[in-house]
Every structure is written in structure tokens, then in C-alpha cells.
């Protein structure tokens, strides 16, 4: 399966039990900042934004004072899982980022999708990739 298929079929799909509820944008990005696959709606990000995200995975709490920035959008960092998941909130939407051995799985959402639904979609794919050694 191509990386684009993972984004299209496992991240940008209808959320279980909620037809027409899907993430706003999603991507799989290598730890080096190279995009493996992304939805057409995923924001163009700056290298320093990706560096900040990677630093927060290695040094949990790094982004808390400044917020998480992606594509020029600032998210307030909320509870995550140190070294494994970063979650951010902005208005009625937010972001979930799951770290795997080689990649970061991104999901961005707006209402009516809930934070829990975004977490489920992103973390399920991230956990699967971890199980596959990726």
C-alpha cells in the first residue's frame, strides 16, 4: 500500500459511525521533515515548525510556552503522551500528531469532528505503523 493510500484510506476517511465526519487535513511526514504523503488540504509548513515538533517529542514540554505552529497556524498545546503524542487546540478545532519509529502521523480537525475522534484516527494508524516497525 502506498503512503498516499494510508492518508486517503485511513486518515481522510469517514469516522466510524459518523458519515461525512472526517479530518480537515492529514499527512505522514518523516522525522527529517520530508513529506511521505499528505491530503491536498495539509498546510505548507516551514522546516523550523517541524524542528520544533521533533524537539517536543524528544524534550516534552518544549512547545508549551510558545504553542505548536504548523503552516503559520498556532495551536495551544494540550495534554499528550510524552514522546509519543502531541495534541493541540485552536478554537473549535485542533491537531493530533503521533510519533512512530520513522514518521509523524498528523491529523487536523474542525467541528463537528471531536478531539477524541481525531485522536482515535491518528493514533490507530500510528500504532499500526509502529507494529509494522515503521
Curated annotation (Swiss-Prot):
InterPro entries: PFN, PFN_euk, PFN_sf, Profilin_CS. The keyword Cytoplasm applies. Gene3D superfamilies: Dynein light chain 2a, cytoplasmic. One of its GO terms (molecular function) is actin monomer binding. The modification Phosphothreonine is found at residue 114. Disulfide bonds join 13-118. One of its GO terms (cellular component) is cell cortex. It is found in: Cytoplasm, Cytoskeleton. Phosphorylated by MAP kinases. SUPFAM superfamilies: Profilin (actin-binding protein). Pfam families: Profilin. Keywords: Actin-binding, Allergen, Cytoplasm, Cytoskeleton, Disulfide bond, Phosphoprotein. A motif (Involved in PIP2 interaction) lies at residues 84-100. Occurs in many kinds of cells as a complex with monomeric actin in a 1:1 ratio. Binds to actin and affects the structure of the cytoskeleton. At high concentrations, profilin prevents the polymerization of actin, whereas it enhances it at low concentrations. The variability of the residues taking part of IgE-binding epitopes might be responsible of the difference in cross-reactivity among olive pollen cultivars, and between distantly related pollen species, leading to a variable range of allergy reactions among atopic patients. This is Profilin-4.
Amino acid at each position: 500500500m502506498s503512503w498516499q493510500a494510508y492518508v486517503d484510506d485511513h486518515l481522510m476517511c469517514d469516522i466510524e459511525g459518523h458519515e461525512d465526519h472526517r479530518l480537515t487535513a492529514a499527512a505522514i511526514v518523516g522525522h527529517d521533515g520530508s513529506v511521505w504523503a499528505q491530503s491536498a488540504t495539509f498546510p505548507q509548513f516551514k522546516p523550523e515548525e517541524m524542528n520544533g515538533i521533533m524537539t517536543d517529542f524528544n524534550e516534552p514540554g518544549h512547545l508549551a510556552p510558545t504553542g505548536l505552529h504548523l503552516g503559520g497556524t498556532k495551536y495551544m498545546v494540550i495534554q499528550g503522551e510524552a514522546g509519543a503524542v502531541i495534541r493541540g487546540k485552536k478554537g473549535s478545532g485542533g491537531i493530533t500528531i503521533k510519533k512512530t519509529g520513522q514518521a509523524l502521523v498528523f491529523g487536523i480537525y474542525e467541528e463537528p469532528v471531536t478531539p477524541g475522534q481525531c485522536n482515535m484516527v491518528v493514533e490507530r494508524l500510528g500504532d499500526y505503523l509502529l507494529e509494522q516497525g515503521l
